[in-house]
Amino acid sequence: MWFPRIDPAVPILAKPSPNETDLPSIATQSHNEPFHMTAGLAARLDRISTHDRYLIVPMDHGITMGAVKGLVDIESTIDGVTRGGADAVLTQKGIAPRVHPNKNDAGYIVHVNASTTIGPDENDKRVTATAEEAVRAGADAVSFHINVGSDHEPEQIEELAELTDDASRLGLPVLAMAYARGPGVDSTDPEALGHAVRLAEEVGADVVKTGYSGDGDTFTRVTESTRLPVVIAGGSKGTDRETAEMVRGAMDGGAAGVSMGRSIFQHDDPEGIARTVSAIIHDDADVDAALQAGGFSDA
């Protein structure tokens, strides 16, 4: 039997002096530092990252695509990616009992909305859990998917705003998966991606995931649009070298890491490819060194 970790009580702080009640100046904050921070929020962000770098492996695809490769025996996959260096794994709430015995020291994120590939509109994500339900499932954070530019953008903005409010009361971090998607929207356009990540910050998220613009130079325009840590989506599975090159380019463009699903959990060696990605994110390795770290002959 597993038991959710309980935070130590937050100490009662002395009443601040008048000048300490002023809000911090944006000009004095470092890039990619969350504006609001409590002890509980900071502790939970530490559980899903390492030194403010993120290797998150989302495995919520079962609700979207069914029991695809890598998710049938999700316990083994979770064990492999966490041994490979994943900072956190992510699932829907119903998978929580299968996660906790297998995630080693990794953090756990519960995703709280979904759609399916066989439904009428995959962009129409519906709420599947609340922040409180996520806490009961043992989550260290919650995540929410919003398609900026889609027909469903208005209600998704409202739902994300409600989630950030509820989560903030619990000291629970929110990862906003903010994609540029919709009629006439280029999902790799740095301006559209920059708009998406800024929206996430404006609505109160703590970390934001978005698509990759294709190279580090253009991705810099995305990361400079927000003070939140920006992590990139992995997209469909490529070669090992393509995956490593994408991660290296994103990090060079100011990313704080990745939230990479199929490229890791559907790999023939999830532990090895996780080690490759981790080497770039956490050790600042180049592509060849990262491939060697994962044990791949492509190096």
Annotate each language-model stretch with its function.
Residues 2-7, 11-110:
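Conserved N-terminal beta1-alpha1 strand-loop-helix module at the mouth
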Residues 49, 82-85, 226, 278-285:
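Structural signal for hydrophobic packing residues in well-ordered secondary-structure cores
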Residues 50, 168-169, 290:
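Short helix-terminating capping/connector loops at secondary-structure junctions
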Residues 54-58, 62-89, 96-98, 107-116, ...:
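Alpha/beta enzyme core
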Residues 232-234, 260:
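Thr-Gly-centered strand-to-loop micro-motif
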Residues 237:
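A C-terminal functional module that forms or caps the active site or interfaces directly
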Residues 251, 266-298:
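C-terminal helical cap(s) of enzyme catalytic domains, especially alpha/beta-barrels
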Residues 258-265:
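Short acidic/histidine-rich active-site segments
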